Amino acid sequence: MNGAEALMQTLCDGGVEVCFANPGTSEMQLVAAIDKQKKMRAILGLFEGVVTGAADGYGRMTDKPAVTLLHLGPGLANGLANLHNAKRARTPLINIVGDHAVDHLKYNAP
């Protein structure tokens, strides 16, 4: 079991049933780990605002925690408005943001 699989197993054990995702290449291990979890459903969104808004709505309507999976800092920036709304509404939401591989850090990519 790798770290991504352990994280997804922990989320499932905590009652998380859905992950709203807009992943990039840096989150592929997490995507693969979600795919292995029979208890978690992955929903792909084509924009981070859609992903975070859907997770907020899901959490408000079901009173169950949802997970978002976003791509790097720009992905987080695109989803921040809805994450702010979710926080203000006390929506049960867990946000995961990927990061560059260590060997890519020297390029200082966004």
How should each PLM-predicted stretch be described?
Residues 1-110:
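N-terminal alpha/beta PP-like core and its mobile active-site loop of ThDP/TPP-dependent enzymes
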